[in-house]
Amino acid sequence: MDKTAKKILIVEDDQFLRDFYQELLTAEGYQIDVAPDGDIALEKLSQGGWDLVLLDIMLPKKDGLQILQDIKTTPPKSAIGPIVVLTNLGHDTVINKAFVLGAGGYLVKSALNPDEVLKEVKSFLQKS
């Protein structure tokens, strides 16, 4: 594995989407890890060192907004890059709350295609 590859954490409970993101981003040379629920996500996030986090809002155990709040309250051991919220909820209130809690951006899952995902990931990584 390339030690210079950017590290991305995918927090998504839907197995199909998790596999989709993982395969797509691994093929581009990114180092990927996954978390299927909020508790596992917080455990992995607490270690820090992520260049980018793709965080679903609707998760079992702890939702994405709770995770953002926990990170804000108790920062990770080392820095993490932007947190991009993944949601089917295009509601302004949910998105605004995510930004208030520290999200760096959002993607509406229903509008995504592979090229768009790669474009957005590259854009967020360049900003970090």
Locations of regions flagged by a protein language model:
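Acidic catalytic/metal-coordinating carboxylates
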Residues: D37, D63-Q69
